[in-house]
């Protein structure tokens, strides 16, 4: 065993002496890196990952759970001011089941289950009323906590005593609620209205006017009517439509000009004025069929012709000056002269066009539109490199976009001329000094400089090459040692005669001969040692 250790020690020492200084530094560095990596891996492997078992605990609840975990000898950690308790991740589910079976955490709140568990115990009327109010508060708080954005809540209910006398006025109930809103969350008006309605319907004789809701920052939440919510929703909808119209026109113009000038040489901004007036109207229009002659279609016609000719034609009627006669009108029989009578009448019924329209106007119209365009010339340092003809082309394109985007009724009512359309367009030709060069900022955006990747890659490659060299060197030495181990020296080794003193023993003489040989002929001395080791 000792000889084996000596052989390994000698080989290691000889291997180390034959290495250059650079190789020694690389070997030590690689060994240190391997040791450090192994330590880091072992540290992370030994540390079990902790996961929250319960969150948002009170001091009392955290104390109860920690005491139970310590009794079970379960590793645990408290964080976030003692409100969060963590245990090993692989034990979270089992511990939750165990804690629930033991009734932990005990919140101290009374809910409706109290009446089922304590039905056999006697309670006075006052005690029963107190327990009932407490249970109602707890159940109502649990309902509120289920809403989005609410982390926790506390409810205080005040129920009046029943009236003793018939004529006595019954007092109204009241409720106060304090909400703990999650960070970064804002309750919308519909949620607030829902809270008021929920609390009002959960407590008898509780009007919504007697409810007060606040958050942890003392912000008061008031109930609002549905119209206010609809107005807010309408405003949000209108702003969304306006933004969408501007975005669509901006993309269209950016695509047109970007194709012509280059995407990085054009910046487009669009501002729109949208008319959201809604109009529903009914029109009953009557117009002639023949608009030139202003005549309709003849539906029916009636022609009457009446003729009389003869002597003694009576005028008929009650003429004369009698009681029923008309003054200055001849009575019957006064005139028997001959006469002629003719009467013609034409009656035609015309039908016209009757148009009934129920018109619902578009929910929005583009009332006004403005387009601002910034163009970088081909030569950024020379604004004159963008020709006037190209600028005129851009102006014409934008004029067409504005004219076709505006509502036709608005265009006709305002009598927009080409000059008016051009006033809605601005084209600015100037260099883009604030342009971001993505090529130069790639290294900065990554967060890690490029040279760090290069150095890291070189070090990793050097370590890999060094390990390969060491393995190959070790194999070569083992092969060489095996050759020496089985190789029998062919030439005898002559030891110099150094017997200077006759009285010396053979052992001392041999030792001196070996020392002299080691100094004068180290290679032969090494071969001799190998042969002795092989014999052993």
UniProtKB/Swiss-Prot annotation:
One Pfam family here: YscJ_FliF
GO CC entries: bacterial-type flagellum basal body, MS ring; plasma membrane
Topology of this chain in the membrane: Multi-pass membrane protein
Principal location: membrane
GO MF annotation, one: cytoskeletal motor activity
Region (Disordered): 308-342
GO biological process: one example: bacterial-type flagellum-dependent swarming motility
Transmembrane segments: 25-45, 451-471
Localization of this protein: Cell membrane; Bacterial flagellum basal body
InterPro entries associated with the record: AMP-bd_C_sf, Flag_M-ring_C, FlgMring_FliF, FliF_N_dom, YscJ/FliF
Gene3D superfamilies with a match to the protein in the record: 3.30.300.30
Keywords on record: Bacterial flagellum, Cell membrane, Membrane, Transmembrane, Transmembrane helix
Assembly and binders: The basal body constitutes a major portion of the flagellar organelle and consists of two rings, one in the peptidoglycan layer and one in the plasma membrane.
Family in the record: Belongs to the FliF family.
NCBIfam families referenced in this protein's UniProt entry, alphabetically: fliF
Record function comment: The M ring may be actively involved in energy transduction.
Name of the protein this chain belongs to: Flagellar M-ring protein
Organism, as annotated: Bacillus subtilis (strain 168)
Taxonomic lineage of the native organism: Bacteria, Bacillati, Bacillota, Bacilli, Bacillales
């Amino acid at each position: 065993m000792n000889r084996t250790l000596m052989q390994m020690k000698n080989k290691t020492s000889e291997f180390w002496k034959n290495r250059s200084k650079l190789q020694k530094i690389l070997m030590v560095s690689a060994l240190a890196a391997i040791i450090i990596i192994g330590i880091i891996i072992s540290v992370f492997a030994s540390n079990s990952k902790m996961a929250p078992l319960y969150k948002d605990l009170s001091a009392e609840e955290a104390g109860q759970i920690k005491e139970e975990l310590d009794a079970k000898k379960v590793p645990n950690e408290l964080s976030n001011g003692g409100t969060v308790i963590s245990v090993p991740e692989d034990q979270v589910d089992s511990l939750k089941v165990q804690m629930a079976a033991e009734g932990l955490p005990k919140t101290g709140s009374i809910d409706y289950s109290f009446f089922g568990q304590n039905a056999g115990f006697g309670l006075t009327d006052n005690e029963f009323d107190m327990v009932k109010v407490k249970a109602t508060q707890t159940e109502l708080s649990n309902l509120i906590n289920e809403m989005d954005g609410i982390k926790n809540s506390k409810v205080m209910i005040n129920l009046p005593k029943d009236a003793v006398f018939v004529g006595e006025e019954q007092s109204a109930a009241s409720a106060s609620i304090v909400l703990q809103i999650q960070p970064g969350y804002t309750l919308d008006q519909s949620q607030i209205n829902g809270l008021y309605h929920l609390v009002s319907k959960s407590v008898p004789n509780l009007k919504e006017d007697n409810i007060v809701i606040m958050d942890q920052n003392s912000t008061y939440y008031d109930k609002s009517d549905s119209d206010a919510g609809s107005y807010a929703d309408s405003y949000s909808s209108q702003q969304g439509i306006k933004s969408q119209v501007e975005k669509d026109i901006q993309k269209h113009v950016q695509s047109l000009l970007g194709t012509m000038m280059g995407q990085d040489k054009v910046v487009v901004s669009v501002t729109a004025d949208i008319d959201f007036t809604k109009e529903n109207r009914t029109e009953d229009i009557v117009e002639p069929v023949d608009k030139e002659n202003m005549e309709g279609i003849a539906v029916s016609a009636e022609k009457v012709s009446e003729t009389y000719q003869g002597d003694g034609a009576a005028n008929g009627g009650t003429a004369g000056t009698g009681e029923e006669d008309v003054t200055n009108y001849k009575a019957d029989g006064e005139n028997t002269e001959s006469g002629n009578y003719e009467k013609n009448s034409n009656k035609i019924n015309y039908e016209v066009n009757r148009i009934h329209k129920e018109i619902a106007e578009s929910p929005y119209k583009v009332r006004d539109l403005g387009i601002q365009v910034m163009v970088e010339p081909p030569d950024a340092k020379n604004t004159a490199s963008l020709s006037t003809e190209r600028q005129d082309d851009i102006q014409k394109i934008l004029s067409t976009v504005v004219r076709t985007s505006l509502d036709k009724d608005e265009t006709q009512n305002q009598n927009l001329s080409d000059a008016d359309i051009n006033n809605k367009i601005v084209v600015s030709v100037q260099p883009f000094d604030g342009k971001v060069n993505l090529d130069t900022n790639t290294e900065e955006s990554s967060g890690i400089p490029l040279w760090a990747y290069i150095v890291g890659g070189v070090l990793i490659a050097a370590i890999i090459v060094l390990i390969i060299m060491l393995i190959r060197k070790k194999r070569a030495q083992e092969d060489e040692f095996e050759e020496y181990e089985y190789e029998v020296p062919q030439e005898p080794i002559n030891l110099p005669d150094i017997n200077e003193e006759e009285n010396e023993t053979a052992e001392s003489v041999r030792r001196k001969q070996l020392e002299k040989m080691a100094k004068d002929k180290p290679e032969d001395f090494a071969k001799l040692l190998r042969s002795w080791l092989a014999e052993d």
